């Protein structure tokens, strides 16, 4: 087994997965943050007589959370370990070589996966850039359409 080549491929796969999944993780964390802030503010309003120290602490923690700059949104260690396990154990290098499979084909397949993930990410970025109305909510679409016609939508 060609260890340096395997490590390069492994690192490439990890980087491609990180770049591909990070935007969706940021959106998911942003939605969770918004939901938790709303939930905590609602709980605070419901129990106006109680002390809100715990709720205020949690509320401040969620308000400080910035999904864009949070480094914990990278690939989790468990995901990395499972990918490493697949590359080390599940491929069974010696068995595949004994069966006549070329190891170069396995590496080519991994490189194709990396290229696919990079191209898919780039495609999604271009669609978002040149078709900005694609990910708008229904309310935002209604406001946009009303603005085109010259109407104001009440908030």
UniProtKB/Swiss-Prot annotation:
Q: GO CC annotation: what is one?
A: mitochondrial matrix
From the Swiss-Prot or TrEMBL record, state where the protein is found: Mitochondrion
Please give the chief subcellular localization of this protein.
mitochondrion
Cross-referenced InterPro entries: Fmc1 (IPR039196)
- The question of whether ATP-binding is a record keyword is answered with no
Does this UniProt record's set of keywords contain Disulfide bond?
no
Q: Could you list this entry's UniProt keywords, alphabetically sorted.
A: Mitochondrion, Stress response, Transit peptide
Query: Which biological process terms from the Gene Ontology are attached to this UniProt entry?
Result: macroautophagy; mitochondrial proton-transporting ATP synthase complex assembly
Q: Which PANTHER family match?
A: ATP SYNTHASE ASSEMBLY FACTOR FMC1, MITOCHONDRIAL (PTHR28015:SF1)
Additional note from the record: Present with 589 molecules/cell in log phase SD medium.
Family assignment? Belongs to the FMC1 family.
Q: Could you tell me what this protein does? A: Needed for the assembly of the mitochondrial F1-F0 complex at high temperature.
This chain belongs to the protein called ATP synthase assembly factor FMC1, mitochondrial
Encoding gene (name)? FMC1
